Amino acid sequence: AATESAVVTIGALQAGTKDNVIPDDALLRINVRTFDTAVRTRVLDAITRIVKAEADASGAPTPPTITTTEHYPLLRNDPSWSARLAGAIRKQLGDDRVHELAAPISASEDFGSFGTEWGVPSVFWYVGGTDPDLYRTAEQAGRVAQDVPTNHNPRFAPVIHPTLETGVQAMIAAVLDALESGLR
């Protein structure tokens, strides 16, 4: 269904070392992001099916080796803790500095492991760190998505100050709120 999105990124393709020698093998590094485990399974199965079919169609002498190197649980924020901590962070930083996302982002992130492994609620948030002039210019041009580099982009370069201070203030607000609540 159209609501079951998936992102498949080919992060690296490595084959051979010389322009005039046909390599024996190739390495394809793929990242898959989904919001649903059933969708994730279908996507991974499709990748396996396609890779095996392409190897077979090309007459490869051996079947491809497919290895999962990293696999993390889906990152799902606990709704009640998200609302609670957003309130605590707003109180600390001000309403104008806390923005809730309208829709989930398919981040490639291992943070989901913490709540899943320990069986506790977890909340993941972003701290904006873009140079204010760069952001303002991109926003005025209606090009934030195109011109503002995000995590994992080679041009991503957060401004250290006040980003670090803001992140620490947000974390302190969240921790104090959680401790004051008795972690209920």
Whereabouts are the PLM-identified features?
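Metal-dependent amide/peptide-bond hydrolase catalytic core
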Residues: 1-184
